């Protein structure tokens, strides 16, 4: 339908297929109220199916596709427990519909008690009703607006930056129209709650209610018809929604009703039961005995399908309130490995194919192999799989068992004959477990001569050493044992026999590398030039030379005159001292190191028992009250500095404890005598 420039419309928004029942009930409630205004709905084509669009076109005058605007910062949506509102910013596309003069926007979860056509006469640019959760804010479920691109671009910039205190459209619009919106009466956007209702106010203003808004995630079509069956105020409001739905979609068996009932909980199940009931009533009595079995089968099929239709759809709804954990329905089938160790024996004849197949079965097996397709099929190796021989018959087995004693007797009568490699029929019965005969002493590559030669080359030096040691401690052995030992043991999987393997110690010895014998492949490398032989190398002498060389090097590098320039290298070149340019007297090089005069440490004095040493003289002078000289003339200390005047130090005035006590500690002024020892007690007591 062509849009008339400057007309007024009721508009709604559909973001997914799940809100189809709400959008249709809203349109029908406005039509039933007698409005003559056009109805428009904004949809996001990427989230709406074609069958849903067809249903909207039967009720709405304009179906307008718009672009989805999502919130990339949905943290505040989780605070409200409404992550489904991540695309609520799409609502700002209403201001982009400048082909309309005035738009009365109504959410798809609203049912109209009456059509509020008087809202189109408001002179304000934007009007909205207060929110029940915070009345200082307005609710964006019902709005009256005048489309303009200025507000659209301003709110689009806020949406792109995620500016919204609740993460949804209501926070964004309240921040944009904070001081410029016109406040509507609460009767234009009554938001009931199942937990709280101001019942006296509802009874008083019940006759003036215009629009009823079901906020939250639990919509009437999501809860189902049987969820609210009481007589409370909230149940009465939900009943108004179901009244409009039943007036247009209940009891009709057409394609439109089937599409709508698919999104309403419990309605598809009731529709199937009603169809089944109608078919059973219309069935002629003459044909009842012919189709009795068919009815039983169809009833079972319908019951299974009904339970599936009434089940919870996780892609559209939240889990039911009284649902049980889904883990109880997990399959409990357990598979175990077969414990049968018997080899597979193919049957003598396979069953014949059925005769009533649509394709023709070949009468004989094909004699020619199919042509190869892949390259590896042309050069495929010969199969090496060995199939078990059929078990011997009972008669042959008994004959072999009777012949066993004679074979044993003949073998005992000729002890000088060497045993043959062919096995004789065993005298002991076979074990019940066939895996006992399995051996791992041989591999397929043990008989390849190239591998044997390669292993012999690697172990040649070991065998030569072992042969030499064996020759030194050889002793006479039997011919059979000598023949068995002369065999080359190049097989990797062979394990030495009891005679070949030595007695192992309790503590394992470390593994040593291979050593070559003196007479075989021994090679001496020439000595390097300038490197002494090992016998001529003395570590102590070399360390002493290194210490002397280091001392000489340090003395050469440390030569420095007392005054004048600095010595550089071993040549002793001096840098002449010269004055710095004017203004650069205080400048210092980054690598300059401050030179301090040498400080002489006090030298220890040798003990002197005659009482004439310097220490005793200092103490004597101190007692007499004289000055204590810092330096004496008895010991002359060489000093590179110029002669300085003698410095005297006054005696200390502190008379407290010595250095053994810390500051703040007390020192004893008197002593307490100790108790007598046991020996002294014995003397005193006697």
From Swiss-Prot:
Residues holding UDP-alpha-D-glucose: 13, 16, 19, 82, 91, 107-109, 139-140, 166, 169-170, 216, 219
GO MF term set: glycogenin glucosyltransferase activity; glycosyltransferase activity; metal ion binding
Residue ranges, compositional bias (Acidic residues): 677-686
Region span, Not required for catalytic activity: 307-686
Bias-annotated ranges (Low complexity): 285-308, 398-416
Record-annotated site: Important for catalytic activity: 91
Residues annotated for Mn(2+) binding in this entry: 107, 109, 213
Keywords: Cytoplasm, Glycogen biosynthesis, Glycoprotein, Manganese, Metal-binding, Transferase, Vacuole
GO biological process, one term: glycogen biosynthetic process
Family under the similarity heading: Belongs to the glycosyltransferase 8 family. Glycogenin subfamily.
Subunit structure: Interacts with glycogen synthase gsy-1; the interaction is direct.
Protein name, UniProt field: Glycogenin
Gene symbol of the encoding locus: gnn
């Amino acid at each position: 339908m062509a849009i008339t420039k400057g007309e007024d419309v009721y508009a709604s928004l559909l973001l997914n297929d799940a809100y189809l029942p709400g959008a249709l009930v809203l349109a029908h409630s406005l039509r039933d109220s007698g409005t003559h205004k056009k109805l428009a709905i904004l949809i996001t084509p990427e989230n709406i199916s074609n069958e849903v669009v067809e249903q909207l076109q039967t009720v709405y005058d304009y179906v307008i596709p718009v672009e989805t605007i999502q919130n990339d910062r949905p943290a505040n949506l989780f605070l409200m427990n409404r992550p489904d509102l991540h695309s609520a910013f799409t609502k700002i596309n209403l201001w982009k519909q400048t082909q309309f003069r005035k738009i009365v926007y109504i959410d798809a979860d609203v049912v109209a008690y009456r059509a509020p056509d008087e809202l189109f006469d408001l002179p304000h640019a934007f009007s909205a009703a207060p929110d029940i959760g915070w009345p200082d804010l307005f609710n964006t479920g019902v709005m009256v607006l005048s489309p303009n691109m200025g507000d659209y671009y301003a709110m689009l910039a806020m949406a792109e930056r995620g500016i919204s205190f609740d993460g949804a459209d209501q926070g964004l619009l309240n921040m944009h129209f904070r001081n410029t919106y016109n406040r509507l009466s609460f009767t234009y956007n009554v938001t009931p709650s199942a937990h709280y209702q101001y019942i006296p106010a509802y009874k008083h203003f019940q006759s003036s209610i215009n629009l009823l808004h079901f906020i939250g995630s639990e919509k009437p079509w999501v809860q189902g018809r049987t969820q609210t069956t009481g007589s409370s105020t909230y149940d009465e409001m939900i009943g108004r929604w179901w009244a409009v739905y039943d007036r247009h979609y209940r009891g009709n068996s057409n394609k439109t009703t089937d599409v709508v009932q698919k999104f309403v909980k419990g309605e598809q199940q009731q529709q199937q039961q009603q169809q089944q009931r109608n078919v059973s009533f219309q069935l002629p009595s003459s044909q009842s005995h012919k189709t009795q079995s068919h009815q039983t089968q169809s009833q079972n099929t319908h019951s299974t399908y009904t339970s599936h239709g009434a089940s919870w759809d996780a892609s559209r709804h939240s889990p039911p309130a009284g649902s049980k954990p889904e883990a109880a329905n997990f399959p409990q089938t357990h598979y175990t490995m077969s414990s049968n160790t018997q080899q597979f024996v193919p049957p003598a004849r396979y069953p014949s194919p059925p005769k009533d197949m649509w394709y023709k079965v070949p009468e004989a097996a094909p004699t020619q192999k199919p042509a190869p397709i892949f390259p590896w099929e042309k050069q495929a190796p010969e199969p090496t799989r060995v199939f078990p021989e059929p078990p011997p018959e009972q008669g042959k087995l008994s004959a072999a068992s009777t012949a066993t004693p004679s074979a044993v007797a003949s073998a005992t009568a000729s002890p000088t004959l060497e045993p043959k490699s062919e096995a004789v029929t065993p005298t002991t019965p076979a074990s019940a477990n066939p895996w006992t005969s399995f051996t791992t002493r041989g591999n397929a590559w043990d008989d390849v001569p190239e591998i044997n030669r390669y292993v012999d080359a690697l172990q040649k030096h070991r065998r030569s050493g072992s042969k030499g040691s064996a020759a030194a401690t050889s002793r006479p052995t039997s011919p059979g044992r000598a023949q068995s030992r002369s065999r080359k043991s190049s097989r990797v999987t062979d394990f030495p026999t009891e005679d070949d393997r030595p007695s192992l110690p309790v503590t394992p010895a470390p593994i040593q590398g291979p050593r070559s014998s003196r007479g075989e492949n021994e090679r001496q490398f020439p000595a390097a030039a300038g490197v002494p032989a090992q016998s001529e190398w003395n570590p102590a002498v070399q360390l002493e030379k290194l210490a002397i060389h280091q001392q000489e090097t340090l003395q050469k590098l440390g030569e420095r005159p007392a005054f004048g320039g600095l010595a550089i290298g071993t040549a002793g070149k001096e840098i002449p001292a010269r004055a710095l340019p004017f203004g650069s007297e205080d400048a210092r090089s980054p690598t300059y190191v401050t030179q301090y005069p040498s400080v002489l440490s006090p030298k220890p004095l040798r003990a002197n028992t005659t009482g004439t040493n310097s220490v005793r003289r200092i103490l004597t002078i101190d007692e007499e009250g004289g000055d204590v000289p810092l330096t004496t003339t008895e010991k002359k200390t060489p000093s590179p500095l110029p002669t300085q005047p003698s410095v005297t130090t006054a005696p200390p005035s502190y008379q407290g404890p010595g250095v053994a006590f810390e500051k703040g500690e007390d020192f004893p002024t008197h002593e307490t005598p100790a108790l007598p020892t046991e020996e002294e007690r014995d003397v005193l007591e006697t």
